[in-house]
């Protein structure tokens, strides 16, 4: 499953690997990878595979789920497809409450005591997913965990999720993606080394000259 999804993401250009010409994230950090899972929306076969995979993860790890919650905005569409497949209620959670109208942060019904699974497109440092989890908990929901399409497998993300006491499972990850990219001849040994060094310590730009 992990390599299959990784292959899909590479084929449609949802993930770019540029170890020799790094991207600059909004945080200012240099990165050899850029992930835009919104592109999956434009590829029916890919998004169907993702929805089926997320459903499988949820059934395996969170079988008692009652509500599917998407993170705004990237997780909304995937949450909708998954909830439809599972015939479950769905809501989505904003990064913060609206400044007008009812001032909702949670759109749709997620009632006190209900068991909820969060659907996220990407786990990097885990910030947006944790914001979603906290909002649902404040509303009295029991958050069973998070499922996502892809994770960078960053230690910072793992630590934040552990600190928030929330389980998280991804369809694919950085390790599987770099392995598939190497198998496809998209990266060579030198590039693979840089990619591996970056994941060990993203904040240390020494990987650029590795």
Swiss-Prot record:
Pfam families: Pribosyltran. It comes from the Bacteria. Orotate binds at residue 124. One of its GO terms (molecular function) is orotate phosphoribosyltransferase activity. Gene3D superfamilies: 3.40.50.2020. SUPFAM superfamilies: PRTase-like. It catalyses: orotidine 5'-phosphate + diphosphate = orotate + 5-phospho-alpha-D-ribose 1-diphosphate. 5-phospho-alpha-D-ribose 1-diphosphate binds at residues 94, 98, 100, 120-128. Transmembrane segments: none annotated. Its cofactor is Mg(2+). Belongs to the purine/pyrimidine phosphoribosyltransferase family. PyrE subfamily. NCBIfam families: pyrE (TIGR00336). Homodimer. PANTHER family: OROTATE PHOSPHORIBOSYLTRANSFERASE, URIDINE 5'-MONOPHOSPHATE SYNTHASE. This is Orotate phosphoribosyltransferase.
